[in-house]
Amino acid sequence: MKPYQRQFIEFALNKQVLKFGEFTLKSGRKSPYFFNAGLFNTGRDLALLGRFYAEALVDSGIDFDLLFGPAYKGIPIATTTAVALAEHHDRDVPYCFNRKEAKTHGEGGNLVGSELQGRIMLVDDVITAGTAIRESMEIIQANGASLAGVLISLDRQERGRGEISAIQEVERDYGCNVISIITLKDLIAYLEEKPEMADHLASVRAYREEFGV
């Protein structure tokens, strides 16, 4: 685990974005942990979040031309990541996001920001079922652009309804890499360093045994 990944886990814990306990997911599964990126909700949170996304992006080495944030959660993420790339990595990258409803007046259309072209890095909070990615792919392809990769905050590394995860489905269907700031594996490595979190470690390991990929 890299220093920025450990720092991200601590940031998420401090903000109550990452919690341990017993949570029922939309799928009906009982999970020993829960991640709610919507709680990164202040100016300082966003500034820090962008730095972690930018770090993971640079670390991945994937070439891309533009950041795309799918509405709605992806919009602030794309914005803060673009700022962090400029301020901390000297990379001035264009960004773009979509509207859920196409505008009929003014400049019209359903895209805001830079022109959607070239190799696109899609940024979002998490991938649950991959629906937002599929909707975004329609927009990207309609504009003649290509998907360079997808960047999310957490990869839960668990099976969907079949034998592979929603993330593996996206990688298979679109031939792109999905990268994340942290994975379930990183989370377990962090818990292993914390004797006071031994109970949580046991339940997270058991969950991975049952649902992991």
UniProtKB/Swiss-Prot annotation:
Record flagged with keyword Nucleus: no
Protein origin, superkingdom: Bacteria
UniProt keyword terms in alphabetical order: Glycosyltransferase, Magnesium, Pyrimidine biosynthesis, Transferase
Binding site for orotate: 34-35, 128, 156
InterPro entries hit by this protein: OPRT, Or_phspho_trans_dom, PRibTrfase_dom, PRTase-like
GO CC entries: cytoplasm
Binding site for 5-phospho-alpha-D-ribose 1-diphosphate: 26, 72-73, 99-100, 103, 105, 124-132
Pathway: Pyrimidine metabolism; UMP biosynthesis via de novo pathway; UMP from orotate: step 1/2
Spans traversing the lipid bilayer: none
Enzyme class: transferase
Biological processes per GO annotation: 'de novo' pyrimidine nucleobase biosynthetic process; 'de novo' UMP biosynthetic process; pyrimidine ribonucleoside biosynthetic process
GO molecular function: magnesium ion binding; orotate phosphoribosyltransferase activity
Named cofactor requirement(s): Mg(2+)
Catalysed transformations (reactions): orotidine 5'-phosphate + diphosphate = orotate + 5-phospho-alpha-D-ribose 1-diphosphate
Subunit structure comment from the entry: Homodimer.
PANTHER family, per the entry: OROTATE PHOSPHORIBOSYLTRANSFERASE 1-RELATED (PTHR46683:SF1)
Reported function: Catalyzes the transfer of a ribosyl phosphate group from 5-phosphoribose 1-diphosphate to orotate, leading to the formation of orotidine monophosphate (OMP).
Protein known as: Orotate phosphoribosyltransferase
